[in-house]
Swiss-Prot record:
Protein name (Swiss-Prot/TrEMBL): Large ribosomal subunit protein uL3
Taxon lineage: Bacteria, Pseudomonadati, Pseudomonadota, Gammaproteobacteria, Lysobacterales
Post-translational note: Methylated by PrmB.
Oligomeric form and interacting partners: Part of the 50S ribosomal subunit. Forms a cluster with proteins L14 and L19.
Transmembrane regions: none
Alphabetical list of InterPro entries matching this protein: Ribosomal_uL3, Ribosomal_uL3_bac/org-type, Ribosomal_uL3_CS, Transl_B-barrel_sf
PANTHER family per the UniProt record, alphabetical: 50S RIBOSOMAL PROTEIN L3 (PTHR11229), LARGE RIBOSOMAL SUBUNIT PROTEIN UL3C (PTHR11229:SF16)
Gene: rplC
Disulphide bridges: none
Keywords: Methylation, Ribonucleoprotein, Ribosomal protein, RNA-binding, rRNA-binding
Signal sequence, renumbered to the chain: none
Pfam family, one: Ribosomal_L3
Any one of the GO CC terms: cytosolic large ribosomal subunit
Stated family: Belongs to the universal ribosomal protein uL3 family.
NCBIfam families for the chain: L3_bact
Length: 216
C-alpha cells in the first residue's frame, strides 16, 4: 500500500520465530496476529473536537458486553470485539475510512519502522535487586541480615520523610510500555500475520498496538 497513514493497528502477540535473509543470516522476529480491525466509529472535528478512527478487533460473547457497548456496536453494524481502540488521523484522511469497514495489515510495508505498545509481563512483588538492579550486600565479612536489603531510605530528622519516587520493593511489571523503531520484516495479509524484527512488550496472547514510528 503506497498511501501513508498515521493510524495504528491492533494485533495480538503470537510469539517469536526467525526468518532467514537471502545471504543466510538468521533474523529474530515477533509474530503479530493481525486480524482485520473493524471500524466502529469515525470522530470528526465538528462533532468530537478531533479527528480519529475508532476500531475493534476479535470477538466477545454477548453475555460479556454491557448495554452501552452493545448499542454502540449495533449502531455501527459491527460485531462486538474484545475492546475499543482509537487512533488520531489527519482530517483529510477521514474520507478513506467508513464505519463498518476494515483496516488490514497492508497499511504497513516491509522495511517500515514501527513502534509497538503492549503491557509487560507481570512479575508480582519483587525486591530492589530484581526490580531496579540494585547491588547485593556482602555475602560474608560480618553481614548476616542485609544481603538483599536496599540500604538507607533517607537522611535524618531533616527532612524526616522518604522522598516520593524512592526506588523500593513493590509490584514489578504489568505496565504499558512501547518499543520504538522496530523494523517490519514481513506482512502476510492472507494469513493475518506481521513479522517484526526483535522483541515486543508483553506475553504471547496479549494485545499490542503497532504504529508508524514517531522518531523514524
Amino acid at each position: 500500500m503506497t498511501k501513508k497513514y498515521s493510524l495504528g493497528f491492533v494485533g495480538r502477540k503470537a510469539g517469536m520465530s526467525r526468518v532467514f535473509t537471502e545471504d543466510g543470516r538468521s533474523v529474530p522476529v515477533t509474530l503479530i496476529e493481525a486480524t482485520p480491525n473493524r471500524i466502529a466509529q469515525i470522530k470528526t472535528v465538528e462533532v468530537d473536537g478531533y479527528s480519529a478512527v475508532q476500531v475493534t478487533v476479535g470477538a466477545r460473547r454477548a453475555a460479556l458486553v454491557n448495554k452501552p457497548a452493545a448499542g454502540h456496536f449495533a449502531k455501527a453494524k459491527v460485531e462486538a470485539g474484545r475492546g475499543l481502540w482509537e487512533f488520531r488521523v489527519e482530517d483529510a484522511q477521514l474520507g478513506d475510512f467508513a464505519v463498518g469497514g476494515e483496516i488490514k495489515a497492508d497499511i504497513f510495508e516491509v522495511g517500515q519502522k514501527v513502534d509497538v505498545q503492549g503491557v509487560t509481563k507481570g512479575k508480582g512483588f519483587q525486591g530492589t535487586i530484581k526490580r531496579y538492579n540494585f547491588r547485593m550486600g556482602d555475602a560474608t565479612h560480618g553481614n548476616s541480615l542485609s544481603h538483599r536489603a536496599p540500604g538507607s531510605l533517607g537522611q535524618r530528622q531533616t527532612p524526616g520523610r522518604v522522598f516520593p519516587g524512592k526506588k523500593m520493593s513493590g509490584h514489578m511489571g504489568a505496565v504499558q510500555q512501547s518499543t520504538q523503531n522496530l523494523e517490519v520484516v514481513k506482512v502476510d495479509v492472507e494469513r493475518g500475520l506481521i513479522a517484526i524484527r526483535g522483541a515486543v512488550p508483553g506475553a504471547a496472547g496479549g494485545d499490542v498496538i503497532v504504529r508508524p514510528a514517531s522518531k523514524a
